Amino acid sequence: MDAIVVSKADRTPRLVDRPRPDPTPGSVLVRTLRVGVDGTDHEVIAGTHGGFPEDADELVLGHEAIGVVADPTDTRFSAGQLVAPTVRRPRGDPTPQFDRGQPDMAAPGTYVERGIDGADGFMADYFTSPADALVALPDSLAAHGFLTEPVSVAEKAIELALASRSAFDWRPDSALVLGNGSLGLLTLAILAARDDTETLYCLGRRSRPDPTIDIIERLGATYIDSRTTPVADIPAAHQPVDMVYEATGHAKHAFDAIDALAPAGVAALLGVPAAGWTFEVPGSDLHRSLVLENKAVVGSVNSNARHFRAAADTLAALPDWLCDAIVTGVHDTAAFADAFRDGETSIKTAVQFDTR
């Protein structure tokens, strides 16, 4: 079967032939339809994030996938059913977090991540997965179901942010998304659909005309160019906001977000910055702001099957035009390299292995 890999000797993604995997009892053989490409994939390719499977020189890429059950073995699934796989698996014996169905809360070193760190991903004609790591999707999501994974990540982060404010009567009506990549835009759409979020902002570094700005404004949000209005200046230029959702991986944004918050606001951090960057921050001022204004900062990574199910519902409810606008390129395996190229008008790309 076809598979897209990187190797220790060659970090350039390439198409190779691999044997089709055989499912074991309790696992499912899935025929892959589409696999998305995101910033994490580029970090894996560059060697700045993740790692290879134990005793292997190659890693099959891809962690955002949708496929069709080819062989359900003895599981609850049926042949032909549409499914999306979660990403984390135990490294050795499962920890209590895995036993509770919360692999997203497992400690580093206790898990591998398909297509990212220590385990082959889903960019292949077929893959196998334990049944409990698969989520059934409606047939209506056959084209865009690979977005379930990134939407699930947004669902978890928003859930954590709301939970941090659940001890009191919090009534947020404004939010700021940092980052106008695909994850930021999908999150903006989720927030736009909430009844309590009346004012939305999205920060980026693109100049008009630009398709991401078009999407932002079509969702009813205000675009902020960080080159003219840095995050810390947003309260003066616009307003302090109740929620900040950081999806840039720019380390200073973690601290600037505190300044952007209104009293009792919360910032959710998702971006993972490169290690080793040091800079000065006004520590006592930030500390005072957090305490005296009841602000909170939460970190969030990965997601679990419950978030995937919520993401499937969210995707099905998004405006029909949105996914078509965000997914700017779907490439078959003969032209898979195009999915890894960033263009001025590209937002989200995917590799297509098969059709429904």
Curated annotation (Swiss-Prot):
GO molecular function terms noted in the UniProt entry: D-glucose binding; glucose 1-dehydrogenase (NAD+) activity; glucose 1-dehydrogenase (NADP+) activity; NAD+ binding; NADP+ binding; zinc ion binding
GO biological process: non-phosphorylated glucose catabolic process
Top enzyme category: oxidoreductase
Region (Disordered): 1-26, 86-107
Catalyses which reaction(s): D-glucose + NAD(+) = D-glucono-1,5-lactone + NADH + H(+); D-glucose + NADP(+) = D-glucono-1,5-lactone + NADPH + H(+)
Binding annotation for Zn(2+): 38, 63-64, 149
UniProt-listed Enzyme Commission number(s): 1.1.1.47
Domain of life where this protein originates: Archaea
Cofactor(s) required, per the database record: Zn(2+)
Keywords assigned: Carbohydrate metabolism, Metal-binding, NAD, NADP, Nucleotide-binding, Oxidoreductase, Zinc
Residues involved in NADP(+) binding: 180-183, 205-206, 270-272, 300-302
Binding residue positions for substrate: 40, 113, 149, 302
Classification via InterPro entries: ADH-like_N (IPR013154), Glc_1-DH_arc (IPR026583), Glu_dehyd_C (IPR031640), GroES-like_sf (IPR011032), NAD(P)-bd_dom_sf (IPR036291)
HAMAP family hit by this protein: Glucose_DH
Annotated function: Catalyzes the NAD(P)(+)-dependent oxidation of D-glucose to D-gluconate via gluconolactone. Can utilize both NAD(+) and NADP(+) as electron acceptor. Is involved in the degradation of glucose through a modified Entner-Doudoroff pathway.
Stated family: Belongs to the zinc-containing alcohol dehydrogenase family. Glucose 1-dehydrogenase subfamily.
Protein name in UniProt: Glucose 1-dehydrogenase
Organism expressing this protein natively: Halobacterium salinarum (strain ATCC 700922 / JCM 11081 / NRC-1) (Halobacterium halobium)
